[in-house]
Structure formats: structure tokens, C-alpha cells
Amino acid sequence: ITRVDVKTITIASGVQAKTLDNVYLGQLPKRCIIGFVDSRAFNGNIQRNPYNFAHFNHNFLCLYVDSVQIPSKPLTPDFSKNQYIRSYHSLFDGCGLNFTDAGNCISRSDYPHGFCLSAFDLTADLSCNDSHWNIIEI
């Protein structure tokens, strides 16, 4: 059984830093995918694309699960200098596509232009895409 849980969190424009505490209460997901969307598109403006995941020049992203930072070194992209390969590579790590002969249909050059998603595998053995069961963390 696979469950998809979508969380929506609003970050006001112009905010320089944002810390979100206790985003998940109860059972932790196996995987967390983070994307940023313009609020006008999210709220239904038909001139905007709600699937345009822009980077908004963010320059630091990481998660903490039980006081453990994921990934161990935060993602620090610099989109103005085209230095975002670790963020792009998180799509492969976080979706279980690393070290496989499979892709995700998002090229490195397309990533900052509407496909800026970051994925994190939250399982203890980094097996969110495998078929075996993991201990459920609460």
C-alpha cells in the first residue's frame, strides 16, 4: 500500500530564511520531495502554470529528522552561477534511481527552468524505492 501525502506551506515573498518545525506529526514518510510554486499559480491563476517548480534563487536546503540532518551536507545551490548539481542529483538519490539504468526525464539544463525539485530518502537504509518493508518511524 502506497500513500501520498501532500503538504502545502506558504512562504511569503521576500523572506530570507524559513525554518519549518514539525511538518510531519506521526508516521514519517519514506521519501520527501520539495518544490516551490508561485502562489498565484497555486491559487488558480490560469495565466500561471502550477507545475512550474521554480528555484526562486534559494541557496540552502536540508531536512532534520530526529535531530539528524538529511543530507549530511546541506544542498547549497547557486543558480546565478549554474552550480546546482547536488540539488539536481538529489532527484536520483531521493527517488531510488541512483546507480540504476533509469532516468527521471529531467535534464540538468532543464532543472532550473521549472523542474527544480529536491528529493530526500528518509529510510534508514536508503531503500525508499525497494520492495522490502522498513520499520515505521513515528
Residue ranges and their predicted role:
Residues I1-I138:
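Flexible assembly/topogenesis modules
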